[in-house]
Regions:
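Conserved acetyl-CoA pyrophosphate-binding loop and the N-cap/start of the following alpha-helix
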Residues: 69, 73-81
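Conserved GNAT acetyl-CoA-binding A-motif
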Residues: 85-99
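Conserved N-terminal entry element of GNAT/NAT acetyltransferase domains
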Residues: 1-9, 141, 147
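Short hydrophobic/aromatic beta-strand or adjacent loop that forms the aromatic wall/cage
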Residues: 34-36, 137-142
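Short glycine/proline-centered loop/turn elements that form peptide/ligand docking sites
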Residues: 65, 79, 100-103, 120-126
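Acetyl-CoA-dependent GNAT
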Residues: 4-67, 79
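Conserved catalytic-core motifs of GNAT/GCN5-like acyltransferases
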Residues: 94-96, 108, 113-134
Length: 147
């Protein structure tokens, strides 16, 4: 297994990113300005995009694991990689996600705690309702992990 940074032609990996953020125009907002990593284990199993949010905060804008490989530790491996790589540069690793029973427990298992929320984020910023695990996503829930 190896994790590598992608500096060029990031759009070649868009299909996996769209699993975590299904509106391409929203992905486009952070894809080029962010730093992208792919986790390969023979082929691409997972990927993420992070951005510098200032004040010592590194934000995971998108993290996605190939559906056939979910639950095998690839997502956690990416988060642990980010925490280790950026521990000297940042004090906080942050992620924003929908209030979903599929994602919140994953981040909590990875050491994140709830920080704050942006009410109506998904209804205000997406052109169609977003559902995850049968639940419509409305608010953006932010979780943070100290580095």
């Amino acid at each position: 297994m190896r994790i590598r940074e992608v500096n060029e032609n990031k759009k070649q990996f868009i299909s996996l990113l769209l699993l975590a953020d299904e509106q391409e125009s929203m992905v486009d907002r952070y894809l080029e300005k962010g730093t992208m990593y792919v986790l390969e284990d023979n082929d691409v199993k997972a990927e993420c995009v992070v951005t510098d949010e200032g004040n010592g905060i590194l934000e995971i804008k998108n993290i996605a694991v190939d559906p056939e490989n979910q639950g095998k530790g690839y997502g956690k491996a990416l988060i642990d990689f980010l925490a280790s790589k950026y521990a000297d540069e940042y004090s906080v690793l942050q992620v924003g996600t929908g209030d979903s029973p599929l994602t919140i427990p994953f981040y909590e298992k990875c050491g994140f705690v709830r920080s704050h929320k942006i009410p109506n984020f998904f209804t205000d910023n997406y052109d169609h309702p977003i559902y995850e695990g049968g639940v419509q996503l409305i608010d953006m829930i932010y979780l943070q992990r100290c580095l």
